[in-house]
């Protein structure tokens, strides 16, 4: 099993079995890595190199060869222990991200060993083809990491050579990890073509993401909504929170940031209208939805659809559009009336406003705070794809999207074209943006829920605990997606995960 990749001293550190014991062996290997806790290995007696070659390749205009950076006892994972103690304080952030990669690889090897042991306990033989597959998977992980390092160091020769091998091994209809790797290969290839020579600053970004600008993206987005539970989960929790906020209110006003992500129908608002029309007591005297968006034709279609549905429910309904970007919004754009109960709904939108400077998002949040909403519903991807270092972002994204591709394995057959469309026209676009873009072009700046808590607090919001964990679990059982999805409560937020790996986090906020 890829023995050439093992360190001479065996597994380093003392994991005490707590991180590995609860892992589900059906999940792909990369999805098992516990990225948030690599520093448990800090007292490791094993030699460390912490990627000295890769760390200094920018200065030396050199990148380590594949066998040097990946092989056993090579400069990537072994040797050079003395360098660790003599590093300056300024190099500590680099060490942390390289430590992440080391920890990821160790987790991969540990899980492979567990898989073989489990097969043996079940009476199965680890045949040659299984060993070959494990070896191929290990090689693919090694190549991806080495290629990411080469791209980060702007070594086009080495990176191009690795990309040729990766394209042959990362198959669109292959295993879960082969498929996710194919998306990262596309991103690395795009980044490589745009990197500037050594000495230049940054990476030139490709065009900004547009909302459903092709028929393929339209179809992929609709398939994601129908098949994957992420968006529907966000809608369910958001609508439940909105209904609670509107209880007893007569004039109700929803401010929707992004309007259903560009979906062709107003799925979320049809459900809310039905619930409001049939709530206890009497329905509101008027429901007003103000949408922020820049795709007028689609919004006109959704407006007509929702108006017809409101008429069928005998619900007084008003639909308005603010044709602006989130960054240019002003409180006056929403024309809030006296006596209106306002809620703000943000489904997978605000991460696009996060920039290198903290001020951009904070300004938007403060202007939204001026609307004095009864509740602000925030639904975002629960992963750290906005770190300052490319390699750290790369590994976080690999971890996150490996879990998503694993879930697609459980939901759809191997050669189902719907799965290929979802992966290649939706999730691959997110991956490529995270991997290949910098500056304003990088809009998929997903962050963990803890970071969103800090951002919301700075803007003057305070958390409102979501007390509906049982309803969320019942909803998950009702939609019957497949086994493996989980709902967890975390500090008042609800998190949808795949085999306990967080995928989507929902939280509610009110004005302080």
Regions found by a protein language model. Give the residues of each.
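Long, compositionally biased intrinsically disordered terminal regions
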Residues: 1-512
């Amino acid at each position: 099993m890829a023995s050439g990749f093992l360190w001479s001293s065996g597994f380093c550190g003392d994991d005490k079995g707590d991180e590995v014991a609860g892992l589900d062996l059906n999940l792909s290997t990369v999805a098992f890595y516990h990225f948030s806790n690599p520093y448990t290995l800090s007292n490791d007696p094993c030699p460390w190199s912490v990627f000295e070659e890769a760390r200094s390749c920018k200065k030396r205009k050199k990148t380590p060869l594949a066998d040097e950076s990946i092989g056993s006892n090579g400069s990537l994972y072994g040797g050079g222990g003395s360098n660790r103690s003599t590093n300056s304080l300024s190099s500590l952030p680099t060490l942390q991200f390289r430590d992440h990669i080391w920890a990821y690889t160790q987790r991969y090897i540990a899980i492979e060993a567990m898989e073989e042991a489990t097969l043996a306990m079940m009476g199965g033989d680890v045949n040659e083809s299984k060993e070959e597959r494990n070896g191929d998977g290990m090689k693919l992980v090694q190549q991806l990491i080495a290629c990411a390092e080469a791209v980060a160091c702007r070594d086009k020769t080495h990176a191009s050579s690795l990309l040729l091998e990766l394209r042959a091994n990362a198959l669109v209809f292959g295993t879960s990890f082969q498929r996710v790797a194919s998306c990262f290969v596309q991103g690395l290839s795009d980044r490589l073509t745009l990197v500037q020579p050594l000495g230049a600053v940054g990476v030139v970004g490709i065009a900004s993401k547009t909302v459903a600008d092709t028929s393929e993206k339209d179809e992929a987005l609709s398939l994601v909504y129908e098949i994957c539970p992420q968006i529907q989960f966000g809608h369910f929790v958001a609508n439940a929170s909105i209904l609670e906020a509107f209880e007893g209110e007569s004039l109700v006003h929803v401010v929707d940031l992004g309007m259903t992500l560009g979906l062709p129908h107003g799925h979320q608002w049809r459900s809310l209208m039905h619930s409001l029309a049939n709530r206890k007591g009497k329905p509101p005297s008027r429901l007003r939805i103000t949408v922020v968006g820049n795709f007028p034709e689609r919004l006109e279609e959704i407006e007509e659809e929702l108006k017809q549905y409101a008429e069928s429910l005998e619900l007084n309904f008003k639909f308005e559009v603010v044709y602006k970007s989130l960054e240019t919004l002003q409180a006056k754009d929403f024309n809030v009336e006296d006596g209106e109960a306002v809620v703000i709904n943000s489904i997978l939108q605000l991460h696009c406003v996060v920039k290198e400077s903290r001020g951009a998002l904070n300004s938007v949040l403060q202007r939204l705070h001026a609307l004095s909403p009864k509740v602000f519903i925030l639904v975002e991807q629960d992963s750290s794809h906005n770190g300052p270092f490319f390699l750290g972002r790369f590994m976080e994204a690999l971890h996150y999207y490996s879990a998503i591709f694993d879930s697609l394995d459980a939901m759809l057959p191997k050669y189902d074209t719907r799965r290929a469309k979802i992966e290649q026209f939706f999730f691959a676009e997110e991956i490529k943006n995270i991997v290949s873009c910098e500056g304003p072009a990088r809009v998929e700046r997903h962050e963990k829920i803890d970071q969103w808590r800090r951002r919301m607090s700075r803007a003057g919001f305070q958390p409102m605990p979501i007390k509906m964990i049982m309803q969320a679990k019942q909803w998950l059982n009702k939609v019957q997606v497949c086994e493996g999805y989980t709902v967890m409560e975390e500090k008042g937020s609800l998190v949808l995960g795949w085999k306990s790996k967080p995928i989507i986090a929902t939280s509610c906020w009110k004005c302080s």
